[in-house]
């Protein structure tokens, strides 16, 4: 799965999510420690909470917290123009890393996780200036992330977009229905159609860019 839309997480939940990434993608023979690129519209990375979680993480992680922190990069983007530049920089970094690894260890593979927060704020900031530009840059950025993920030589790349549930009401209601259908007290089935005017940001991304 290249791109996922998830409900915005608290600092504690986000830290646990990052820990789970490292737990599930520990370096094995021929792989390197996963890299995390945390992008937000403000410098909100929960470093203290993350450090606290690392201190209590299972020994199965088998790497030090310093090693993990060295592989976490925090990027602040105030609008979609800055996000587009950040993704271009990421693309360049992956290309350089790919060329370097081919020289040192051609069989090695890498995994990069992009955690994208505050996309709704970036979109609004750009939309206030130029609504056409906002739509164009949103599509350019998301398409570029999918292309990078599809390039086998770039290694594995996955993007988690964290948004308030209000930004994907149709997807959220469908998910709630699926969960309720497995319970003893199912709720009334909501509309699950993706069509119609007035798509919210998250529903738009889910419709066109997620797998």
UniProtKB/Swiss-Prot annotation:
Endpoints of the signal sequence: none
Predominant place of localization: cytoplasm
Record's GO cellular component terms: cytoplasm; nucleus; Shu complex
Location(s), subcellular: Cytoplasm; Nucleus
InterPro entries per UniProt: Csm2, P-loop_NTPase
Alphabetic keyword roster: Cytoplasm, DNA damage, DNA repair, Meiosis, Nucleus
Protein name: Chromosome segregation in meiosis protein 2
Organism: Eremothecium gossypii (strain ATCC 10895 / CBS 109.51 / FGSC 9923 / NRRL Y-1056)
